[in-house]
Regions:
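Right-handed parallel beta-helix/beta-solenoid
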Residues: 73-135
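Beta-rich extracellular carbohydrate-active architectures
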Residues: 177, 214, 219, 237, ...
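N-terminal extracellular ligand-recognition/capping segment immediately after the signal peptide
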Residues: 124-125, 130-131, 144-171, 180-181, ...
Length: 281
């Protein structure tokens, strides 16, 4: 395992443990459990913190410490608003039939697509809900055959989407910002924790979202109300918008990349915990 990966995982352990403790403390029925665990968890936090410090000092190259990553567009094959893709003849026929005009191909640096399904509310696609399409995606793929692509046609999708860690190498493409919209209204004021209030949650590694809007309409008076919570390692959000009021975008942990995205909110609308998020917003 590369040093960068170990460093990332140690950092994520600290974040996830603190989130677990916060969750216990916010649950009234688990108050005694939280108190019993607070000291052991505090000791564990110190252990992981020291381990991370030693590892960073001993194994991570000095040249990489404190340097902001500057990705080149060729890494993502974005050129003049286009995303180049490589796919089989069958998959390409489906792809072209649904007319994703803004994402037609270039010849080099193709992103390989293993299969494609469409979500269309009028029933003319493969699925009418995003959750059903996510459920149909293969589990625990290694990416060698490319991404499983979900094309979500224009519409307002009132559903809470959760992409589990076994749905690796999933790509979700919409018709554009404010065209393909996933919306919800969970909030802390209505009894949800900040962590569980998200309209869209993803923890699957190598997730990609393009041309989507993620929205939480709870309102400013409802306090924390997350539109997107991401704990997906090596995930990418390109040309997406995140709309809410408080804690709109919750970048929880691990490595994430955002490019040409819009984030809307009124207070603390971007929240992060020990994650690496090279942005180009």
């Amino acid at each position: 395992m590369q040093a960068d990966n170990v460093q990332t995982l140690l950092s994520a352990v600290l974040t996830n443990q603190q989130t677990c403790l916060d969750g216990l403390q916010s649950t009234s029925s688990a108050g005694s459990v939280g108190n019993d665990l607070s000291v052991p968890l505090s000791n564990d936090t110190k252990l992981y913190s020291v381990s991370l410090a030693f590892f960073t000092r001993g194994w991570v190259s000095k040249k990489k410490r404190g340097i902001t990553w500057k990705p080149k567009s060729k890494h993502f094959a974005f050129s003049h608003g286009r995303l180049s893709m490589k796919m089989s003849a069958r998959t390409r026929a489906i792809y072209e039939s649904v007319s994703i005009r803004k994402l037609l191909q270039a010849e080099n640096n193709d992103i390989e697509i293993s299969d494609i399904v469409t979500v269309q509310q009028d029933g003319q696609g493969n699925f009418t809900t995003i959750n059903d399409a996510v459920a149909a995606a293969p589990n625990n793929t290694d990416g060698s055959n490319g991404y499983f692509m979900i094309y979500v046609t224009a519409g307002i999708y009132e559903e809470y989407v959760s992409i589990a860690k076994n749905k690796k190498y999933l790509m979700m493409v919409g018709d554009g910002i404010n065209q393909t919209v996933i919306t919800g209204n969970r909030s802390v004021a209505d009894g949800w924790t900040t962590f569980n209030s998200a309209t869209f949650t993803v923890v699957a590694p190598n997730f990609v979202a393009v041309n989507m809007t993620f929205r939480n309409t709870a309102g400013a008076v409802k306090h924390q109300a997350v539109a997107v919570r991401s704990g997906a390692d090596l995930s990418t959000f390109y040309s997406c918008s995140f709309e809410g009021y408080q804690d709109t975008l919750y970048t929880h942990s691990l490595r994430q990349f955002y490019r040409e995205c819009d984030i809307y909110g009124t207070v603390d609308f971007y929240i992060w915990q020990c994650c690496s998020c090279p942005p180009k917003l």
